[in-house]
Design a protein with these regions (language model features):
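Short coil/linker segments at helix-helix boundaries
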Residues: 62-66, 153-198
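TPR alpha-solenoid repeat register
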Residues: 58-60, 75, 109, 143, ...
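Short coil/turn linking the two alpha-helices of tandem helical-hairpin repeats
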Residues: 119-121, 148, 153-162, 223-227
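Short coil turns that delineate tetratricopeptide repeat
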Residues: 54, 70, 104, 138-139, ...
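N-terminal leader/linker segments that initiate helical-solenoid repeat arrays
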Residues: 18-63, 69-74
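Conserved structural position within tetratricopeptide repeats
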Residues: 51, 98-101, 131-135, 197, ...
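Canonical tetratricopeptide repeat
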Residues: 62, 78, 112, 146, ...
Length: 227
């Protein structure tokens, strides 16, 4: 019985050992390719090593590479994409930040980093990143979808709190009612209008988006009520 237990344990261990050995061989070849000036080949080998054993590839990145080269940035991109695909979002974020330090206005990296931040639960930073994306590319569909929904939901929450506070007033004075209406106008200008701009752009880019159309109808109705 003990023999079979050991046998199965060895079988289970073999794939991970083989992957580690494969990654080690590939990373040795990465070093050789870099020494020979074969950057594209080195990146291809590094991608394979990352797939075989991402932990070894990560250690290689931090300990063996000159970080001041375009090739090392491409390898950081490989690690970022790999960790994001495998839902290791903390590490993915770390490598996206490596990329953004070198190229802070790269839209593709900003979008990927924003997605990662959402998965990490940092909605505020995702919003900041998507806002930067729109500043660089006003037609970015993903940023417009996220921000349109984000601004709308934030405005809805603010409006709900304002309405609840107003309902608690047994006999509101004209001054209190005026403040309530001004509060609604401020929420509309600071939230609903921004959501409207993003979602209108979504419909221009993606006319079949029923969700964007539905939210825009709700904003239009509220706008009419405020006039």
């Amino acid at each position: 019985m003990r023999i079979w237990t050991v046998f199965f344990f060895v079988l289970l261990m073999c794939p991970s050992v083989a992957e580690a050995q494969t990654a080690e061989i590939l990373l040795q070849k990465v070093t050789e390719a870099l020494s020979a000036g074969k950057a594209d080949y080195a990146v291809s080998l590094f991608r394979q090593a990352t797939a075989a054993n991402a932990e070894q590839a990560e250690i290689y990145y931090w300990t063996q590479l000159n970080k001041n080269t375009d090739t090392s940035l491409r390898m950081a991109g490989e690690l970022a994409a790999h960790f994001k695909d495998y839902r290791v979002y903390d590490k993915a974020y770390l490598f996206y930040m490596e990329l953004l330090q070198a190229h802070p206005d790269d839209v593709q990296t900003l979008v990927a980093c924003a997605e990662t931040q959402l998965m990490r639960g940092d909605e505020d930073d995702a919003r900041r990143l998507y806002e930067k994306v729109l500043g660089l590319d006003a037609d970015n569909l993903q940023a417009n979808i996220f921000l349109g929904n984000y601004y709308f939901l934030q405005a809805e929450n603010r409006k709900k709190r304002l309405e609840e506070d107003f309902k608690h007033l047994a006999s509101p004075t004209r001054m209190q009612y005026a403040r309530y209406r001004n509060g609604l106008s401020d929420i509309f200008a600071g939230g609903y209008e921004k959501a409207k701009a993003c979602l209108q752009r979504v419909l221009q880019l993606f006319p079949s988006s029923s969700e964007a159309g539905h939210i825009l109808e709700r904003i239009k109705k509220l706008e009419a009520e405020l006039k």
